[in-house]
Protein backbone atom coordinates (compact mmCIF):
# COMPACT_ATOMS: atom_id res chain seq x y z
CA UNK A 1 0.00 0.00 0.00
CA UNK A 2 1.00 3.64 0.33
CA UNK A 3 3.37 2.92 3.21
CA UNK A 4 5.66 1.49 0.55
CA UNK A 5 5.02 4.30 -1.92
CA UNK A 6 7.99 6.00 -3.51
CA UNK A 7 7.27 9.51 -4.67
CA UNK A 8 9.36 11.45 -7.14
CA UNK A 9 8.04 14.94 -7.48
CA UNK A 10 8.64 17.02 -10.50
CA UNK A 11 7.51 20.60 -10.38
CA UNK A 12 7.25 23.51 -12.67
CA UNK A 13 7.35 26.45 -10.27
CA UNK A 14 7.89 30.13 -10.26
CA UNK A 15 8.45 31.91 -7.01
CA UNK A 16 7.71 35.39 -5.77
CA UNK A 17 5.19 38.23 -5.86
CA UNK A 18 2.73 39.70 -8.27
CA UNK A 19 2.82 43.37 -9.30
CA UNK A 20 1.67 45.61 -6.49
CA UNK A 21 -1.28 46.96 -8.42
CA UNK A 22 -2.84 43.53 -8.96
CA UNK A 23 -6.04 43.16 -6.96
CA UNK A 24 -6.54 39.58 -5.79
CA UNK A 25 -9.25 38.42 -3.45
CA UNK A 26 -8.91 35.29 -1.31
CA UNK A 27 -10.97 33.98 1.56
CA UNK A 28 -8.16 33.57 4.07
CA UNK A 29 -4.52 34.42 4.74
CA UNK A 30 -3.49 30.77 4.32
CA UNK A 31 -5.06 29.44 1.14
CA UNK A 32 -5.90 25.76 1.17
CA UNK A 33 -6.84 23.06 -1.31
CA UNK A 34 -7.50 19.33 -1.28
CA UNK A 35 -6.92 16.91 -4.16
CA UNK A 36 -8.51 13.47 -3.90
CA UNK A 37 -7.49 10.87 -6.49
CA UNK A 38 -10.00 8.09 -7.19
CA UNK A 39 -7.26 5.47 -7.10
CA UNK A 40 -9.59 2.46 -7.11
CA UNK A 41 -12.00 3.60 -9.82
CA UNK A 42 -11.78 2.86 -13.57
CA UNK A 43 -9.49 5.04 -15.65
CA UNK A 44 -9.57 6.07 -19.32
CA UNK A 45 -6.76 6.13 -21.86
CA UNK A 46 -5.78 9.42 -23.45
CA UNK A 47 -4.19 9.88 -26.86
CA UNK A 48 -0.66 11.37 -26.78
CA UNK A 49 -1.61 13.14 -30.03
CA UNK A 50 -2.84 15.94 -27.75
CA UNK A 51 0.81 17.01 -27.49
CA UNK A 52 0.97 17.80 -31.21
CA UNK A 53 2.25 20.87 -33.01
CA UNK A 54 1.43 23.10 -35.96
CA UNK A 55 3.58 25.00 -38.46
CA UNK A 56 2.57 27.48 -41.13
CA UNK A 57 4.46 29.40 -43.81
CA UNK A 58 4.25 32.62 -41.78
CA UNK A 59 6.30 34.42 -39.16
CA UNK A 60 9.60 32.51 -39.36
CA UNK A 61 7.97 29.25 -38.37
CA UNK A 62 9.47 27.40 -41.33
CA UNK A 63 11.90 29.74 -43.08
CA UNK A 64 14.10 31.01 -40.27
CA UNK A 65 12.62 28.40 -37.95
CA UNK A 66 12.87 24.71 -38.82
CA UNK A 67 14.32 25.39 -42.25
CA UNK A 68 17.18 27.81 -42.92
CA UNK A 69 19.46 26.78 -45.80
CA UNK A 70 22.86 28.41 -45.53
CA UNK A 71 22.73 28.79 -41.75
CA UNK A 72 25.82 27.49 -39.92
CA UNK A 73 23.34 25.70 -37.63
CA UNK A 74 21.64 23.89 -40.52
CA UNK A 75 22.63 20.68 -42.28
CA UNK A 76 23.24 20.29 -46.01
CA UNK A 77 19.49 20.03 -46.64
CA UNK A 78 18.72 23.25 -44.76
CA UNK A 79 17.21 21.81 -41.57
CA UNK A 80 18.17 23.59 -38.34
CA UNK A 81 19.68 20.82 -36.24
CA UNK A 82 19.43 22.78 -32.98
CA UNK A 83 15.71 23.33 -33.54
CA UNK A 84 15.03 19.69 -34.34
CA UNK A 85 16.99 18.57 -31.27
CA UNK A 86 15.00 20.89 -29.00
CA UNK A 87 11.59 19.98 -30.42
CA UNK A 88 12.40 16.29 -30.03
CA UNK A 89 12.53 16.94 -26.27
CA UNK A 90 8.79 17.64 -26.50
CA UNK A 91 8.05 14.25 -28.10
CA UNK A 92 5.68 15.95 -30.54
CA UNK A 93 3.67 13.05 -32.03
CA UNK A 94 2.00 14.90 -34.93
CA UNK A 95 2.64 18.08 -36.94
CA UNK A 96 -0.09 19.90 -38.88
CA UNK A 97 0.95 21.78 -42.05
CA UNK A 98 0.92 23.95 -44.25
CA UNK A 99 -1.86 26.01 -42.67
CA UNK A 100 -3.71 27.72 -41.26
CA UNK A 101 -5.24 30.34 -43.49
CA UNK A 102 -2.05 30.25 -45.56
CA UNK A 103 -3.36 27.05 -47.14
CA UNK A 104 -6.09 28.97 -48.99
CA UNK A 105 -3.55 29.96 -51.64
CA UNK A 106 -1.38 26.83 -51.47
CA UNK A 107 -1.19 24.41 -54.39
CA UNK A 108 0.88 21.39 -53.52
CA UNK A 109 2.29 20.65 -56.99
CA UNK A 110 4.19 23.96 -56.95
CA UNK A 111 6.14 22.69 -53.95
CA UNK A 112 7.43 19.36 -55.27
CA UNK A 113 10.10 18.45 -57.81
CA UNK A 114 13.27 20.23 -58.87
CA UNK A 115 11.56 23.26 -60.39
CA UNK A 116 9.69 24.91 -57.53
CA UNK A 117 7.23 27.71 -58.31
CA UNK A 118 7.45 30.72 -55.98
CA UNK A 119 4.34 32.86 -55.58
CA UNK A 120 2.94 35.86 -53.76
CA UNK A 121 0.42 34.93 -51.07
CA UNK A 122 -1.56 38.16 -51.29
CA UNK A 123 -3.99 37.10 -48.56
CA UNK A 124 -1.21 37.29 -45.97
CA UNK A 125 1.43 39.42 -47.65
CA UNK A 126 4.00 36.62 -47.86
CA UNK A 127 6.44 35.89 -50.67
CA UNK A 128 6.53 32.09 -50.73
CA UNK A 129 9.62 30.49 -52.36
CA UNK A 130 8.16 26.96 -52.14
CA UNK A 131 11.56 25.52 -51.26
CA UNK A 132 9.86 23.80 -48.31
CA UNK A 133 7.17 21.53 -49.72
CA UNK A 134 5.67 18.09 -49.24
CA UNK A 135 8.96 16.15 -49.31
CA UNK A 136 10.65 18.54 -46.87
CA UNK A 137 7.65 18.41 -44.54
CA UNK A 138 7.62 14.62 -44.52
CA UNK A 139 11.36 14.53 -43.85
CA UNK A 140 10.95 16.99 -40.97
CA UNK A 141 8.24 14.80 -39.45
CA UNK A 142 10.40 11.70 -39.79
CA UNK A 143 13.31 13.43 -38.07
CA UNK A 144 11.05 14.53 -35.22
CA UNK A 145 9.39 11.13 -34.91
CA UNK A 146 6.04 12.81 -35.63
CA UNK A 147 3.16 11.83 -37.88
CA UNK A 148 2.40 14.25 -40.72
CA UNK A 149 -1.03 15.91 -40.75
CA UNK A 150 -1.80 17.73 -44.01
CA UNK A 151 -4.42 20.46 -44.26
CA UNK A 152 -5.82 20.79 -47.78
CA UNK A 153 -6.70 23.97 -49.67
CA UNK A 154 -10.50 23.69 -49.74
CA UNK A 155 -10.64 26.45 -52.37
CA UNK A 156 -8.82 24.13 -54.78
CA UNK A 157 -10.61 21.51 -56.85
CA UNK A 158 -11.70 18.22 -55.36
CA UNK A 159 -9.46 16.50 -57.88
CA UNK A 160 -6.41 18.48 -56.71
CA UNK A 161 -7.06 17.46 -53.12
CA UNK A 162 -7.54 13.79 -54.01
CA UNK A 163 -4.38 13.90 -56.12
CA UNK A 164 -2.35 15.08 -53.12
CA UNK A 165 -3.50 12.01 -51.19
CA UNK A 166 -2.45 9.86 -54.15
CA UNK A 167 0.93 11.59 -54.37
CA UNK A 168 1.59 10.86 -50.70
CA UNK A 169 0.07 7.41 -50.29
CA UNK A 170 -0.38 5.60 -53.61
CA UNK A 171 1.85 2.62 -54.40
CA UNK A 172 1.07 2.59 -58.12
CA UNK A 173 -0.24 4.99 -60.73
CA UNK A 174 0.84 8.36 -62.13
CA UNK A 175 1.23 10.11 -58.78
CA UNK A 176 3.26 7.27 -57.29
CA UNK A 177 5.48 7.53 -60.36
CA UNK A 178 5.68 11.30 -59.95
CA UNK A 179 6.70 10.90 -56.29
CA UNK A 180 9.36 8.35 -57.27
CA UNK A 181 10.69 10.68 -59.96
CA UNK A 182 10.98 13.36 -57.26
CA UNK A 183 13.16 11.10 -55.14
CA UNK A 184 10.85 9.03 -52.94
CA UNK A 185 9.71 5.67 -54.34
CA UNK A 186 8.09 4.55 -51.08
CA UNK A 187 4.71 6.07 -50.12
CA UNK A 188 4.65 8.64 -47.33
CA UNK A 189 1.58 6.99 -45.73
CA UNK A 190 0.06 10.21 -44.44
CA UNK A 191 -2.87 9.25 -42.19
CA UNK A 192 -4.32 12.62 -41.20
CA UNK A 193 -5.97 14.94 -43.74
CA UNK A 194 -8.10 18.04 -43.22
CA UNK A 195 -10.49 19.44 -45.82
CA UNK A 196 -9.77 23.15 -45.47
CA UNK A 197 -9.09 25.49 -42.61
CA UNK A 198 -11.56 27.66 -40.66
CA UNK A 199 -14.38 27.49 -43.20
CA UNK A 200 -18.13 27.69 -42.63
CA UNK A 201 -21.32 27.55 -44.67
CA UNK A 202 -23.33 24.92 -46.48
CA UNK A 203 -21.34 25.26 -49.69
CA UNK A 204 -18.21 24.36 -47.77
CA UNK A 205 -19.94 21.48 -46.01
CA UNK A 206 -21.15 20.04 -49.31
CA UNK A 207 -17.58 20.22 -50.59
CA UNK A 208 -16.31 18.49 -47.45
CA UNK A 209 -18.64 15.58 -48.17
CA UNK A 210 -17.56 15.27 -51.79
CA UNK A 211 -13.85 15.78 -51.06
CA UNK A 212 -13.74 13.34 -48.15
CA UNK A 213 -15.45 10.72 -50.31
CA UNK A 214 -12.95 11.31 -53.13
CA UNK A 215 -9.93 11.19 -50.82
CA UNK A 216 -11.08 7.97 -49.16
CA UNK A 217 -11.53 6.38 -52.57
CA UNK A 218 -7.81 7.00 -53.08
CA UNK A 219 -6.90 5.62 -49.64
CA UNK A 220 -9.66 4.29 -47.42
CA UNK A 221 -7.32 4.10 -44.41
CA UNK A 222 -6.92 7.87 -44.02
CA UNK A 223 -8.54 9.84 -41.19
CA UNK A 224 -10.40 12.94 -42.37
CA UNK A 225 -11.23 16.12 -40.49
CA UNK A 226 -12.81 19.42 -41.45
CA UNK A 227 -13.52 22.82 -39.92
CA UNK A 228 -15.89 22.54 -36.99
CA UNK A 229 -15.49 25.73 -34.96
CA UNK A 230 -12.99 28.53 -34.71
CA UNK A 231 -13.11 31.43 -32.32
CA UNK A 232 -15.20 31.80 -29.17
CA UNK A 233 -18.35 30.17 -30.62
CA UNK A 234 -18.12 26.44 -30.11
CA UNK A 235 -21.50 25.32 -31.45
CA UNK A 236 -21.41 23.33 -34.71
CA UNK A 237 -23.85 23.60 -37.64
CA UNK A 238 -26.00 20.42 -37.48
CA UNK A 239 -25.95 20.38 -41.30
CA UNK A 240 -22.27 19.39 -41.10
CA UNK A 241 -23.04 16.18 -39.24
CA UNK A 242 -26.08 15.38 -41.39
CA UNK A 243 -24.28 15.96 -44.69
CA UNK A 244 -20.66 14.95 -44.14
CA UNK A 245 -20.64 13.19 -40.79
CA UNK A 246 -20.30 9.65 -42.13
CA UNK A 247 -17.05 10.61 -43.89
CA UNK A 248 -15.46 12.34 -40.89
CA UNK A 249 -13.21 10.88 -38.23
CA UNK A 250 -12.22 14.13 -36.52
CA UNK A 251 -13.62 17.63 -36.13
CA UNK A 252 -11.22 20.58 -36.22
CA UNK A 253 -11.54 23.11 -33.40
CA UNK A 254 -9.50 26.32 -33.09
CA UNK A 255 -9.24 28.95 -30.40
CA UNK A 256 -6.79 31.63 -29.31
CA UNK A 257 -8.01 33.19 -26.08
CA UNK A 258 -6.11 36.46 -26.55
CA UNK A 259 -6.79 37.65 -30.13
CA UNK A 260 -3.87 39.62 -31.54
CA UNK A 261 -4.37 39.47 -35.31
CA UNK A 262 -5.08 43.15 -36.00
CA UNK A 263 -4.54 44.80 -32.60
CA UNK A 264 -1.77 43.64 -30.31
CA UNK A 265 -2.64 42.89 -26.68
CA UNK A 266 -0.40 41.96 -23.78
CA UNK A 267 -2.67 41.40 -20.75
CA UNK A 268 -1.17 40.92 -17.32
CA UNK A 269 -0.68 37.61 -15.53
CA UNK A 270 -3.99 37.65 -13.68
CA UNK A 271 -5.99 38.52 -16.78
CA UNK A 272 -4.43 35.49 -18.45
CA UNK A 273 -5.26 33.27 -15.49
CA UNK A 274 -8.90 34.32 -15.71
CA UNK A 275 -8.92 32.61 -19.13
CA UNK A 276 -7.43 29.34 -17.91
CA UNK A 277 -10.75 27.51 -17.47
CA UNK A 278 -12.01 28.51 -20.93
CA UNK A 279 -10.61 25.38 -22.66
CA UNK A 280 -12.80 23.17 -20.44
CA UNK A 281 -15.98 25.05 -21.33
CA UNK A 282 -15.05 25.25 -25.01
CA UNK A 283 -14.47 21.50 -25.27
CA UNK A 284 -17.70 20.78 -23.40
CA UNK A 285 -19.69 22.89 -25.88
CA UNK A 286 -18.19 21.07 -28.89
CA UNK A 287 -18.85 17.70 -27.26
CA UNK A 288 -22.47 18.77 -26.74
CA UNK A 289 -22.87 19.54 -30.46
CA UNK A 290 -21.38 16.18 -31.47
CA UNK A 291 -23.51 14.35 -28.92
CA UNK A 292 -26.72 16.06 -30.04
CA UNK A 293 -25.95 14.93 -33.59
CA UNK A 294 -25.72 11.33 -32.36
CA UNK A 295 -22.08 11.05 -33.42
CA UNK A 296 -20.25 11.09 -30.12
CA UNK A 297 -17.75 8.26 -30.21
CA UNK A 298 -17.64 8.23 -34.01
CA UNK A 299 -16.27 11.74 -34.49
CA UNK A 300 -13.48 12.87 -32.18
CA UNK A 301 -12.14 16.38 -31.56
CA UNK A 302 -8.88 17.61 -33.06
CA UNK A 303 -8.10 20.90 -31.30
CA UNK A 304 -5.59 21.47 -34.07
CA UNK A 305 -4.89 25.15 -33.46
CA UNK A 306 -4.72 26.46 -29.92
CA UNK A 307 -2.72 28.87 -27.84
CA UNK A 308 -3.24 31.46 -25.15
CA UNK A 309 -2.24 34.14 -27.67
CA UNK A 310 -2.76 34.43 -31.40
CA UNK A 311 -0.01 36.01 -33.50
CA UNK A 312 0.02 39.60 -34.69
CA UNK A 313 -0.51 40.04 -38.43
CA UNK A 314 -2.07 43.49 -38.97
CA UNK A 315 -3.43 44.72 -42.28
CA UNK A 316 -4.18 41.28 -43.73
CA UNK A 317 -7.36 39.34 -43.05
CA UNK A 318 -6.09 36.08 -44.47
CA UNK A 319 -9.35 35.73 -46.38
CA UNK A 320 -9.46 38.52 -48.97
CA UNK A 321 -6.67 38.95 -51.54
CA UNK A 322 -5.20 42.44 -51.83
CA UNK A 323 -2.63 44.03 -54.08
CA UNK A 324 0.67 43.98 -52.20
CA UNK A 325 3.49 46.33 -53.13
CA UNK A 326 6.37 45.16 -50.96
CA UNK A 327 8.18 48.47 -51.54
CA UNK A 328 5.25 50.47 -50.16
CA UNK A 329 6.23 52.01 -46.77
CA UNK A 330 2.81 51.07 -45.36
CA UNK A 331 3.30 47.40 -46.31
CA UNK A 332 6.85 47.46 -44.95
CA UNK A 333 5.53 48.81 -41.63
CA UNK A 334 2.76 46.19 -41.45
CA UNK A 335 5.24 43.38 -42.09
CA UNK A 336 7.62 44.81 -39.49
CA UNK A 337 4.77 44.93 -36.95
CA UNK A 338 4.46 41.13 -37.12
CA UNK A 339 7.65 40.91 -35.08
CA UNK A 340 5.68 42.01 -32.00
CA UNK A 341 4.69 38.35 -31.61
CA UNK A 342 8.37 37.48 -31.18
CA UNK A 343 8.83 39.79 -28.18
CA UNK A 344 10.27 37.56 -25.41
CA UNK A 345 8.62 39.43 -22.54
CA UNK A 346 5.16 38.27 -23.69
CA UNK A 347 5.79 34.65 -22.76
CA UNK A 348 5.70 34.48 -18.98
CA UNK A 349 4.56 32.05 -16.32
CA UNK A 350 1.04 32.87 -17.52
CA UNK A 351 1.80 30.97 -20.72
CA UNK A 352 3.31 28.07 -18.79
CA UNK A 353 0.25 27.67 -16.57
CA UNK A 354 -2.28 28.27 -19.33
CA UNK A 355 -0.56 25.54 -21.32
CA UNK A 356 -0.95 23.17 -18.37
CA UNK A 357 -4.59 24.21 -17.99
CA UNK A 358 -5.26 23.42 -21.64
CA UNK A 359 -3.67 19.98 -21.38
CA UNK A 360 -5.64 19.27 -18.22
CA UNK A 361 -8.86 20.08 -20.10
CA UNK A 362 -7.90 17.68 -22.90
CA UNK A 363 -7.01 14.95 -20.41
CA UNK A 364 -10.29 15.37 -18.54
CA UNK A 365 -12.05 14.95 -21.88
CA UNK A 366 -9.83 12.11 -23.12
CA UNK A 367 -12.82 10.17 -24.48
CA UNK A 368 -13.56 12.98 -26.93
CA UNK A 369 -10.32 14.91 -27.58
CA UNK A 370 -7.80 12.77 -29.45
CA UNK A 371 -5.55 15.43 -30.95
CA UNK A 372 -4.37 18.95 -30.13
CA UNK A 373 -1.77 21.04 -31.95
CA UNK A 374 -0.22 24.07 -30.32
CA UNK A 375 -0.03 26.93 -32.81
CA UNK A 376 2.67 27.27 -33.52
CA UNK A 377 5.51 25.02 -32.37
CA UNK A 378 8.39 27.40 -33.19
CA UNK A 379 8.61 31.21 -33.31
CA UNK A 380 5.58 33.51 -33.25
CA UNK A 381 3.69 32.43 -30.10
CA UNK A 382 5.31 29.01 -29.91
CA UNK A 383 7.26 27.42 -27.05
CA UNK A 384 10.57 27.63 -28.94
CA UNK A 385 12.02 30.94 -30.11
CA UNK A 386 14.47 30.52 -32.99
CA UNK A 387 16.95 33.22 -33.99
CA UNK A 388 19.95 33.19 -36.37
CA UNK A 389 22.43 32.25 -33.64
CA UNK A 390 20.42 29.76 -31.63
CA UNK A 391 17.22 29.06 -29.72
CA UNK A 392 15.42 30.11 -26.54
CA UNK A 393 13.08 27.78 -24.68
CA UNK A 394 10.13 29.87 -23.57
CA UNK A 395 8.28 29.14 -20.34
CA UNK A 396 5.62 26.96 -21.94
CA UNK A 397 8.32 24.83 -23.59
CA UNK A 398 9.05 23.42 -20.13
CA UNK A 399 5.35 22.79 -19.45
CA UNK A 400 5.07 20.85 -22.69
CA UNK A 401 8.23 18.86 -21.99
CA UNK A 402 7.02 17.90 -18.52
CA UNK A 403 3.59 16.77 -19.67
CA UNK A 404 4.85 14.89 -22.72
CA UNK A 405 7.59 13.07 -20.82
CA UNK A 406 6.18 12.51 -17.35
CA UNK A 407 2.50 11.60 -17.56
CA UNK A 408 1.35 7.99 -17.53
CA UNK A 409 -0.97 6.35 -20.07
CA UNK A 410 -4.36 6.53 -18.32
CA UNK A 411 -6.36 9.33 -16.70
CA UNK A 412 -8.05 8.86 -13.32
CA UNK A 413 -10.69 11.00 -11.68
CA UNK A 414 -9.32 13.80 -9.53
CA UNK A 415 -11.56 15.84 -7.27
CA UNK A 416 -10.18 19.28 -6.42
CA UNK A 417 -11.53 21.41 -3.59
CA UNK A 418 -10.04 24.87 -3.92
CA UNK A 419 -10.62 28.50 -3.16
CA UNK A 420 -11.30 30.82 -6.08
CA UNK A 421 -8.76 33.26 -7.47
CA UNK A 422 -10.66 36.45 -8.27
CA UNK A 423 -9.63 39.36 -10.47
CA UNK A 424 -12.16 42.05 -11.25
CA UNK A 425 -15.47 40.33 -12.03
CA UNK A 426 -13.85 37.02 -13.04
CA UNK A 427 -12.60 34.06 -11.05
CA UNK A 428 -11.01 30.64 -11.54
CA UNK A 429 -10.07 27.81 -9.20
CA UNK A 430 -6.82 28.65 -7.47
CA UNK A 431 -5.66 25.03 -7.74
CA UNK A 432 -6.15 22.60 -10.62
CA UNK A 433 -5.02 18.98 -10.88
CA UNK A 434 -4.95 15.94 -13.12
CA UNK A 435 -3.98 12.35 -12.26
CA UNK A 436 -2.54 9.70 -14.58
CA UNK A 437 -1.52 6.08 -14.02
CA UNK A 438 0.29 3.40 -16.02
CA UNK A 439 -1.05 0.06 -17.28
CA UNK A 440 -0.01 -1.77 -14.11
CA UNK A 441 -1.98 0.60 -11.90
CA UNK A 442 1.11 1.08 -9.73
CA UNK A 443 2.86 4.10 -11.20
CA UNK A 444 1.05 7.41 -10.88
CA UNK A 445 1.85 10.91 -12.12
CA UNK A 446 -0.27 13.67 -10.58
CA UNK A 447 -0.07 17.26 -11.82
CA UNK A 448 -1.03 20.09 -9.46
CA UNK A 449 -0.91 23.80 -10.17
CA UNK A 450 -1.29 26.92 -8.07
CA UNK A 451 -2.48 29.84 -10.18
CA UNK A 452 -2.15 32.45 -7.44
CA UNK A 453 0.51 35.02 -8.41
CA UNK A 454 1.96 35.59 -4.94
CA UNK A 455 0.56 33.17 -2.34
CA UNK A 456 1.55 29.64 -1.46
CA UNK A 457 -1.29 27.16 -1.13
CA UNK A 458 -1.40 24.49 1.57
CA UNK A 459 -2.47 21.48 -0.47
CA UNK A 460 -3.58 18.08 0.82
CA UNK A 461 -3.01 15.15 -1.55
CA UNK A 462 -5.00 11.97 -0.98
CA UNK A 463 -5.02 8.68 -2.86
CA UNK A 464 -8.54 7.61 -2.02
CA UNK A 465 -8.61 8.02 1.77
CA UNK A 466 -4.85 7.60 2.22
CA UNK A 467 -2.48 10.53 2.63
CA UNK A 468 0.84 10.96 0.85
CA UNK A 469 3.63 11.52 3.38
CA UNK A 470 7.41 12.07 3.42
CA UNK A 471 10.27 14.07 1.91
CA UNK A 472 10.67 13.59 -1.80
CA UNK A 473 12.86 14.69 -4.64
CA UNK A 474 11.33 17.35 -6.83
CA UNK A 475 12.13 19.01 -10.11
CA UNK A 476 11.07 22.62 -9.97
CA UNK A 477 10.75 25.24 -12.66
CA UNK A 478 11.68 28.38 -10.75
CA UNK A 479 11.29 32.04 -11.56
CA UNK A 480 11.55 35.21 -9.55
CA UNK A 481 8.18 36.59 -10.71
CA UNK A 482 4.96 35.49 -12.41
CA UNK A 483 6.08 37.84 -15.18
CA UNK A 484 9.46 36.11 -15.64
CA UNK A 485 10.45 35.09 -19.15
CA UNK A 486 13.42 33.71 -21.05
CA UNK A 487 15.26 35.63 -23.76
CA UNK A 488 18.58 35.60 -25.61
CA UNK A 489 20.38 37.42 -22.78
CA UNK A 490 18.80 35.30 -20.01
CA UNK A 491 17.72 32.00 -21.59
CA UNK A 492 17.64 30.12 -18.28
CA UNK A 493 15.75 32.52 -16.06
CA UNK A 494 12.82 30.08 -16.07
CA UNK A 495 14.08 26.51 -16.10
CA UNK A 496 13.83 23.29 -14.06
CA UNK A 497 15.97 22.44 -11.04
CA UNK A 498 15.87 19.76 -8.36
CA UNK A 499 14.80 20.37 -4.76
CA UNK A 500 13.53 18.38 -1.77
CA UNK A 501 9.81 18.74 -1.07
CA UNK A 502 8.01 17.67 2.10
CA UNK A 503 4.56 16.10 2.49
CA UNK A 504 3.50 15.94 6.13
CA UNK A 505 0.30 13.98 6.77
CA UNK A 506 -0.63 14.57 3.14
CA UNK A 507 0.03 18.30 3.16
CA UNK A 508 2.56 20.13 1.02
CA UNK A 509 2.96 23.73 -0.03
CA UNK A 510 2.40 24.67 -3.65
CA UNK A 511 4.49 27.75 -4.47
CA UNK A 512 2.91 30.75 -6.18
CA UNK A 513 2.32 30.49 -9.94
CA UNK A 514 3.52 26.90 -10.01
CA UNK A 515 2.87 23.49 -11.52
CA UNK A 516 3.95 20.35 -9.66
CA UNK A 517 3.94 16.83 -11.10
CA UNK A 518 4.13 14.09 -8.47
CA UNK A 519 5.14 10.53 -9.34
CA UNK A 520 3.76 7.87 -6.98
CA UNK A 521 4.96 4.28 -7.20
CA UNK A 522 2.76 1.77 -5.32
CA UNK A 523 4.51 -1.55 -4.73
Regions found by a protein language model. Name each.
Residues 11-15, 133, 265-267:
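Alpha-helix capping and helix-coil boundary motifs
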Residues 22-237, 241-250, 276-314, 323-523:
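Non-catalytic accessory regions flanking glycosidase/transglycosidase catalytic cores in CAZymes
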Residues 255-271, 316-318:
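Active-site His/acidic residue clusters
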Amino acid sequence: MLKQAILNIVALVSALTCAAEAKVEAQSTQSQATIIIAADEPTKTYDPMIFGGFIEHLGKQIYGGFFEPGSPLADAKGFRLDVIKAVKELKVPVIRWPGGCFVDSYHWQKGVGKKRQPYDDDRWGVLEPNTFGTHEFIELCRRLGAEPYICQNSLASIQEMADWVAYCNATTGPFAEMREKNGHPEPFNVRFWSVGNEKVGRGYIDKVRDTAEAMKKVDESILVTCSGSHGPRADIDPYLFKTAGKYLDLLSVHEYWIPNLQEHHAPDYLSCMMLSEKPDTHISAVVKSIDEAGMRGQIKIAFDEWNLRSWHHPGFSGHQPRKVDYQDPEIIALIKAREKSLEPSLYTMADALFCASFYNACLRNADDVTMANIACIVNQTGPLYVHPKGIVKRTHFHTMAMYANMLKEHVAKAQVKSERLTYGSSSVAMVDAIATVDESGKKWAIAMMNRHPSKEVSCTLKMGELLVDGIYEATVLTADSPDAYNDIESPNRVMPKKIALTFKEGITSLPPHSLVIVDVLIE
